Amino acid sequence: MKVDSLGEWRRTHYSSEIKPELDGKEVLVLGWVKDIRDLGAIRFIVMQDREGTVQITVLRKKTPKEVVEKTENLQRQYCIGVKGIVKKTEMTARGVEIVPSEVRILGVAQHPLPLDVTGRTPSDIDVRLDARVLDLSRQENRAIFRVQHVALEATRGFLSKLGFIEVQTPRIIASATEGGAALFPVDYYDKQAYLAQSPQLYKEQLVI
């Protein structure tokens, strides 16, 4: 399938920013197709980006013909851009949807997918690890990283207010200085070097 060029298109909103207050406004969103439900006269496309999901509603009798035809080619995990009008609705959990006026297919995914990105069909851990990129797109996994981020950010802020500073110790060292630890030699600008195994020695010096 021939994909479209992004061209002059630039995202105006993330999915989490599409709210009922934008009713009647034109927006441009970018993301991946998470799910598709085709009911004949109406097609629902759930688009996901890093912030969450938003529903794209294609009405066969009201949506431009070229948009209807293009959405017929969509499959899960296709990368798309959607330009359309925000509409308030009580039919979605978030109370909002986007009625598209133009759709661009920016990338395609090879099918069948190794796992169900909707989560309806559970996958065992081996499958999830083999398809880690897809697995990490699940909201449950993304939430873990967000919690970690907030916790680390709060910890850094707390310690910074107490006068602590954050340092980054070397990751590549010039000589074997870590006792009996297994060493991993690397060529670094035509010189022998090693990957540091532990920041212990550097942190001991900083404490002093």
Q: Where on the chain are the PLM-derived regions?
A:
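Class II aminoacyl-tRNA synthetase catalytic cores and aaRS-like
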Residues: 1-208
